[in-house]
Amino acid sequence: MAQAEGTPDVPSMGRRQFMNLLTFGTVTGVALGALYPVVNYFIPPSSGGSGGGVTAKDALGNDIIVSEFLANHNSGERTLAQGLKGDPTYVVIEGEQTLAEYGLNAVCTHLGCVVPWNGSENKFICPCHGSQYDNTGKVVRGPAPLSLALVHANVSDDKLVFTQWEETDFRTGEKPWWV
């Protein structure tokens, strides 16, 4: 066949060169995939900036709309929601149409069971080993060594937003153990 004028001969890639390139690409991809979690471990998490919170979700995974939530719940109730890191978190209703400024992580500090609210006794009682917490989540009976973790509960655009609690624990007067 005749070549068109002005087009140089382009040598085709040999089989060995193609296999070397394919092997190099595969090894590189596997190495990068294996290194990603290691590198990601050493990168500190973002501080979250001004919007570092998580919108609370109900049992169906829908955002909690505060006006609707308060209309359907009574004063003194503690209702589970999905909070920071997906942990079950209690939304505390303090007064008429008022949410507490804090939420309670519902994971027991003993062995990680979800602690249900016992309204008749006005406390949280762990079903696994009997730890008890008062209505603010402060441990009152072991074997749990620590109080339930706190989160800030704020309202933004009529949605409930949980943010990390880093201040002094108002129940104990000490630095929070969960930070």
From Swiss-Prot:
<feature type="binding site">
    <location>
        <position position="126"/>
    </location>
    <ligand>
        <name>[2Fe-2S] cluster</name>
    </ligand>
</feature>
<dbReference type="GO" id="GO:0004497">
    <property type="term" value="F:monooxygenase activity"/>
</dbReference>
<comment type="function">
    <text>Component of the cytochrome b6-f complex, which mediates electron transfer between photosystem II (PSII) and photosystem I (PSI), cyclic electron flow around PSI, and state transitions.</text>
</comment>
<feature type="domain" description="Rieske">
    <location>
        <begin position="61"/>
        <end position="162"/>
    </location>
</feature>
<keyword id="KW-0793">Thylakoid</keyword>
<keyword id="KW-0813">Transport</keyword>
<keyword id="KW-0812">Transmembrane</keyword>
<dbReference type="InterPro" id="IPR014349">
    <property type="entry name" value="Rieske_Fe-S_prot"/>
</dbReference>
<keyword id="KW-0408">Iron</keyword>
<dbReference type="GO" id="GO:0045158">
    <property type="term" value="F:electron transporter, transferring electrons within cytochrome b6/f complex of photosystem II activity"/>
</dbReference>
<comment type="subunit">
    <text>The 4 large subunits of the cytochrome b6-f complex are cytochrome b6, subunit IV (17 kDa polypeptide, PetD), cytochrome f and the Rieske protein, while the 4 small subunits are PetG, PetL, PetM and PetN. The complex functions as a dimer.</text>
</comment>
<keyword id="KW-1015">Disulfide bond</keyword>
<dbReference type="GO" id="GO:0051537">
    <property type="term" value="F:2 iron, 2 sulfur cluster binding"/>
</dbReference>
<dbReference type="GO" id="GO:0016705">
    <property type="term" value="F:oxidoreductase activity, acting on paired donors, with incorporation or reduction of molecular oxygen"/>
</dbReference>
<dbReference type="GO" id="GO:0009496">
    <property type="term" value="F:plastoquinol--plastocyanin reductase activity"/>
</dbReference>
<protein>
    <recommendedName>
        <fullName>Cytochrome b6-f complex iron-sulfur subunit</fullName>
        <ecNumber>7.1.1.6</ecNumber>
    </recommendedName>
</protein>
<dbReference type="GO" id="GO:0046872">
    <property type="term" value="F:metal ion binding"/>
</dbReference>
<keyword id="KW-1133">Transmembrane helix</keyword>
<feature type="binding site">
    <location>
        <position position="129"/>
    </location>
    <ligand>
        <name>[2Fe-2S] cluster</name>
    </ligand>
</feature>
<feature type="binding site">
    <location>
        <position position="108"/>
    </location>
    <ligand>
        <name>[2Fe-2S] cluster</name>
    </ligand>
</feature>
<dbReference type="GO" id="GO:0015979">
    <property type="term" value="P:photosynthesis"/>
</dbReference>
<keyword id="KW-0479">Metal-binding</keyword>
<dbReference type="GO" id="GO:0031676">
    <property type="term" value="C:plasma membrane-derived thylakoid membrane"/>
</dbReference>
<comment type="similarity">
    <text>Belongs to the Rieske iron-sulfur protein family.</text>
</comment>
<dbReference type="InterPro" id="IPR036922">
    <property type="entry name" value="Rieske_2Fe-2S_sf"/>
</dbReference>
<dbReference type="Pfam" id="PF25471">
    <property type="entry name" value="TM_PetC"/>
</dbReference>
<keyword id="KW-0249">Electron transport</keyword>
<keyword id="KW-0001">2Fe-2S</keyword>
<feature type="transmembrane region" description="Helical">
    <location>
        <begin position="21"/>
        <end position="43"/>
    </location>
</feature>
<feature type="disulfide bond">
    <location>
        <begin position="113"/>
        <end position="128"/>
    </location>
</feature>
<keyword id="KW-1278">Translocase</keyword>
<dbReference type="InterPro" id="IPR005805">
    <property type="entry name" value="Rieske_Fe-S_prot_C"/>
</dbReference>
<dbReference type="InterPro" id="IPR023960">
    <property type="entry name" value="Cyt_b6_f_Rieske"/>
</dbReference>
<feature type="binding site">
    <location>
        <position position="110"/>
    </location>
    <ligand>
        <name>[2Fe-2S] cluster</name>
    </ligand>
</feature>
<dbReference type="Pfam" id="PF00355">
    <property type="entry name" value="Rieske"/>
</dbReference>
<dbReference type="InterPro" id="IPR017941">
    <property type="entry name" value="Rieske_2Fe-2S"/>
</dbReference>
<keyword id="KW-0472">Membrane</keyword>
<keyword id="KW-0411">Iron-sulfur</keyword>
